Amino acid sequence: MNAALIAALLILGALTLDATAYSSTCERIPCTNNSDCHGPDLCQCRPPRGDDFGYFCSEY
């Protein structure tokens, strides 16, 4: 039981680490076009997804 719990926590930690943003300067900055997004070249103004209503800078 303990080994299964430890393995599950390690897998969850690895998945969470992969889901973190690459650049803290790019994520979740409100924008109207790509020039508003200062940061890496991959940082672009993206349309809203889901319940978001505004455009935000993102690397994805």
Curated annotation (Swiss-Prot):
GO MF annotation, one: toxin activity
Protein's cellular compartments: Secreted
Signal peptide: 1-21
Domain of life (superkingdom): Eukaryota
Motif (Cell attachment site): 49-51
Annotated keywords: Disulfide bond, Hemostasis impairing toxin, Platelet aggregation inhibiting toxin, Secreted, Signal, Toxin
GO cellular component, as recorded: extracellular region
Function description: Tick salivary platelet aggregation inhibitor that plays an important part in the anti-hemostatic strategy of ticks. Inhibits platelet aggregation induced by ADP, thrombin and thromboxane A2 (TXA2). Blocks platelet adhesion to soluble collagen (most probably through the binding to alpha-2/beta-1 integrin (ITGA2/ITGB1)) and binds to purified glycoprotein IIb/IIIa (ITGA2B/ITGB3) in a dose-dependent manner. In vivo, reduces thrombus weight effectively in a rat arteriovenous shunt model and inhibits thrombosis in a carrageenan-induced mouse tail thrombosis model.
Homology family: Belongs to the ixodegrin family.
Designated name of the protein: Ixodegrin YY-39
Tissue: Expressed in salivary glands.
Post-translational modification as stated in the protein's UniProt record: Contains 3 disulfide bonds.
Organismal lineage: Eukaryota, Metazoa, Ecdysozoa, Arthropoda, Chelicerata
